[in-house]
A protein has these predicted regions:
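A short, N-terminal "cap"/entry segment at the start of jelly-roll beta-barrel domains
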Residues: 34-74, 154-156
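Bacterial Sec-dependent N-terminal signal peptides
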Residues: 1-24
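Ligand-binding loop in jelly-roll beta-barrel domains
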Residues: 127-151
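Conserved short histidine dyad/triad with adjacent acidic residue
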Residues: 76-92
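A cytosolic small-molecule/anion-sensing beta-strand core signal
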Residues: 102-103, 118-119, 137
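Short acidic-glycine-tyrosine-enriched beta hairpin
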Residues: 113-127
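Glycine- and acidic-residue-biased ligand/ion/polar-headgroup-sensing regions
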Residues: 94-106, 111
Length: 156
């Protein structure tokens, strides 16, 4: 009797686990969901080697273009080119952002605080903090995001 009971329990556990596995494997991966399952998010990634000449520039805003340099579910690196006077309008997102100023001069506003940054400088933006910039001298920013910005890939 005890053996029969253990077999029944084992069978119920197997059925329950099988049902759970099919639920998660059929679950739609929402890359914009900050709680995106690690396994799901890791399935999306760029090639290992990327050459600037092969990467397209995308219009982000007037006078602003971006080039996606590499990504996976947890990280994205984006090169952003600004013309003088271009504005990166104030916005916020759930992603952590760290940016390196590769060239040019920018007036950055982060959470209401304004600073001027030049080539060699950098800044950090915590999740859900309002930030934006004005380009004072044409330049390039190297943005890193965690997790990746699925919206930049057209995945919503």
């Amino acid at each position: 009797m005890k053996k029969l009971f253990l077999m029944a329990v084992a069978m119920m556990v197997t059925i329950a686990m099988s049902a759970q596995t099919s639920k998660t494997s059929n679950k739609k991966c929402d890359m914009n969901d900050k709680n995106c399952e690690k396994e799901c998010c890791q399935k999306t990634r760029s090639a290992s080697f990327l050459y600037e000449k092969d990467l397209k520039w995308e219009d982000a805003e007037p006078g602003v273009q971006r080039q996606i340099m590499g990504y996976d579910g947890q990280l994205m690196v984006v090169k952003v080119k600004f013309e003088k006077g271009a504005v990166g309008k104030a916005h916020k997102h759930y992603h952590t952002q760290a940016t390196y100023v590769a060239s040019g001069k920018f007036e950055l506003t982060i959470d209401g605080e304004k600073k001027i940054l030049e080539a060699g400088d950098g800044y950090y933006v915590a999740p859900d903090v309002l930030h934006g910039c004005v380009c004072l001298e044409a330049g390039v920013l190297i943005d890193t995001f965690s997790p990746m910005r699925a919206d930049f890939l057209g995945k919503k």
